[in-house]
A protein has these predicted regions:
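Solvent-exposed beta-strand/loop surfaces, strongest in extracytoplasmic domains of secreted
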Residues: 1-249
Length: 249
């Protein structure tokens, strides 16, 4: 890396002098920044080579949501160096290194590092567990909602971008009473969630759309005469024997 400056000799002549920078990289006191300084001070037009700082994501974003939590770089070196590549390790710098193209996503501590001129700066941060929310789930109502004497169960699965959810228990309510979703009527669905690797536990989680209605069966009864089917008029009331069935029952 070269710099240039105008030099005036003893005779008053001016000429342009090229300067070869010799950059020294120094780690900041907080361990998060690297500063470049030219140590070849002879005829150096500017010894300041700038600095670069690695910074953790904003604290309010460090809650699991299925997205990457990348560290960022602030400021730039003026030495002609490319922006350093950020690498990530699990834990406080002693754990496994994440593969290229992978970033902190799941709950846990991570260390993000950059290296320039043999000097490494780093920052450690931690992703916290999230509280389960209805948006983390996909609700599907039962396929058949006509009464048939069988329980009607909804399907609730975690969203495709979500991992580390605890076991889910699905419950059905009419008003405030937990019931089996079998008879005709309106049902509200609630879930309880156990602790998971990325989520806290939750109870009675629901959404206004987590509901369905079982409709009563509508069918014509079948009426058949049974026993004696031949009668002689007597002027008296005659009551035949009949059998009434619905759907063969």
């Amino acid at each position: 890396d070269r710099g240039y400056m105008v030099i005036k000799d003893a005779q008053g002549n001016l000429y342009l002098s090229a300067h070869q920078h010799s950059w020294q990289y120094t780690l900041g006191a907080d361990g998060k920044s690297i500063t470049a300084t030219c140590v070849n001070t002879t005829n150096c037009p500017n010894i300041d080579g700038g600095s670069v700082t690695i910074k953790a994501p904003e604290e309010n974003t460090l809650i699991y949501d299925g997205s990457n939590k990348k560290a960022i770089l602030e400021n730039k070196l003026l030495t002609g160096e490319k922006d350093p590549t950020i690498s990530y390790t699990v834990g406080n710098g002693q754990g496994a290194t994440l593969p290229d193209g992978s970033y902190p996503t799941n709950v846990g501590a991570y260390t993000a590092s950059i290296t320039v001129g043999g000097v490494t700066a780093s920052v450690t941060y931690e992703i916290q567990k999230a509280d389960p929310a209805a948006k983390n789930f996909v609700f599907t109502a039962p396929g058949s909602l006509t009464y048939d004497g069988m329980a009607k169960t909804a399907d609730i699965k975690t969203a495709t971008n979500i991992t580390g959810m605890g076991d889910v228990m699905v419950k059905y309510y009419q008003g405030e009473t937990e019931v089996q979703p079998m008879n005709a009527g309106e049902y509200k669905v609630k879930i309880s969630v156990a602790y998971g690797s990325n989520f806290n536990a939750a109870s009675d989680l629901t959404d206004e759309n987590w509901a369905f209605r079982i409709t009563p069966i509508i069918t014509e009864p079948t009426v058949e005469l049974s026993g004696n089917t031949t009668y002689t008029y007597t002027g008296e009331r005659i009551t035949p024997d009949v059998t009434v069935t619905i759907d063969g029952r």
